[in-house]
Amino acid sequence: MDGARRSRLLGVWSLAVYLFLYAPLAVLAAFSFNRERLTAQWRGFTLDWYARLLGNTQVLTALRNSLLVAAVATVLATAIGTAAALAFHRHRFRRQGVLDALLTLPIVIPEIVMAASLLLLFAGIGLRLGFLTVVLAHVAFSVSYVVLVVRARLAGFDRSLEEAAMDLGAGPWRTFLQVTLPGIAPGVMAAALLVFALSIDDYVVTSFVAGVGSTTLPLQIYSMVRSGVSPEINAASTVLLVATALLLFAAWRVEQGGRARSAAAPAVLGLAILAAPFVLVGPPAPEDRVLNVFIWSGYLPPETVRDFEARHGVRVNVDLYDSLEALLAKLQAGNASYDVVCPSNYAVEILLHQNLLQPLDRSALPHLSNVDPAWLDRDFDPGNRHTVPYFTGTCGIGYRRSRVGEVDSWRALWDPRWKGRILMLDDARETLGAALRLLGRSVNTSDEPTVRRAMRLLVQQKPLVRAYDSANFEDALLAGDVWLAQGWNGEFARVMDLDPDLAYVVPKEGSTTYLDSLAIPAGAPHPKLAHAFLDFVMEAEVSAAICRSMRYTTPNRAALAFLPPAIRKNPAIFPPREVVGRLELLRDIGPATTLYDRLWTEVKTAR
């Protein structure tokens, strides 16, 4: 093979690699300008999603938090890392190799390990989760990068310049400020920009250590994905992507030194664009007039928040979680400061067992009488002493009628005719639960042989499954990527409004139901305001407005009078009585949770 041909082949391979890396990002950015909510169809150019993004207070607050955290963490990490780099480069001391390895360890250890260890540390010393813990965590994982970058710059630094300055009478500090620091400035600047980029992008560590009012933009975006990947999320991701790219480009150019430093201007411009919406976020309210809510994304309409703020003259901080495990971890750590949380029924059992919820004052909840008695006095919270019902729902099958006809059984998800067109939830309890109901067993069984039979059913089904996805199953069905999808009724109800060919069914073998409740954590800083919020969302008109917006089933009987017939008579939102009779609440199964998780892992890794 001649040189020209090898060169062309190398160019083709390089192009393929870059397309693989960057084509998805280009698609994301392009569809942030799509007029259609469905990302699989292009309906024309629009800037509406960016306008909506600028009007989203939660996103703007998260953006502000990201910028503040990144700025403070950058200053601290750069100062500490530069000092450490100088010390390790210029001095020799005992066990330096061990200390050097420990200093760079955060680069190689898994992020999840660092996140969990930091959460335990903060809980152990009684430090409340919030802005400070996020900053400290970001400094902890980024100092190592500063040390590596600055030491690389120090390797080429001529120390004779320092000696000459000191021979001329300059003291140590003057020598450092006027000789050393200017000489290593490109490395320091590059390290600072790298830290800023790492901080503003971080999700894993931040998700563990963030507390009240410290939700960052990555946390906000990831939580919003639970309601589907809308162009608004694409717009926010594009803004973050562009800013990060500018910062990394500037870091590389600054490290080159000389005239290349002028290339830092795009980074400054990117930061200015990001910071512009900051002024749109109002100043924080006094501490005693703040309500801190920790809830699922897509569960609390912004209009409801604004109405409560206007009525009570308070500010509501809404932080979002993407799994019940995240909620449990924050409350179990004991150093969060939330006033209202939204656990599912089996999470309530765990929280009550650990005394993490405070009793409710029923006299402050007159609108509890609006709730359907069928959803009150459940065995996970007898007498509703600690919780009030908020949303309920079912797990079933969403399907495309024109492709698969009418569906009434879980067996449709095992039908080889639909190979590659089936989607299952990435959820151990729900997915094993579907197999258990197909076997005629309870979704709450802890009998290992029975659960193993369900696991084997899922392994047999796996060649038919296109994906396991709990975040975007309804979008995959709407786009036509799959024709059958296991999922929850609220998400399917929203996309059924967009495509009449879509339908939802609770299989005849039965399925799971859940009851998400509102509760006040033990030690909540504003319990009176929390009671006012719980009572507010139980008002008939407020509950109806939430149901209209979110499309989940409201257990508020009085709200039905304020719902349009299209919602009130939609069986996907309000299942008929015969369907309710074959639903089973998910319960806390205690030690058997480990069994479910282990067997679900076997399903996911099966070939």
List each language-model region with its residue ranges.
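Transmembrane alpha-helices
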Residues: 12-25, 105, 115, 140, ...
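Membrane-interfacial helix termini and adjacent extracytoplasmic/periplasmic loops
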Residues: 38-40, 47, 95-96, 112-141, ...
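Interhelical loop and adjacent transmembrane-helix boundary motif
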Residues: 3-6, 37, 50-58, 199-255
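Extracytoplasmic ligand-binding site segments that recognize negatively charged/polar headgroups
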Residues: 337, 342-481
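Glycine/proline-centered hinge or cleavage motifs at structural transition points of membrane proteins
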Residues: 168-169, 182, 391, 395
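C-terminal transmembrane helix and the adjacent membrane-cytosol boundary/short C-terminal tail
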Residues: 4-12, 92-95, 151-162, 166, ...
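Transmembrane-helix boundary motif in ABC transporter permease subunits
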Residues: 1-6, 71-103, 120, 248-257
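Early extracytoplasmic/lumenal segment of secretory-pathway proteins
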Residues: 283-351
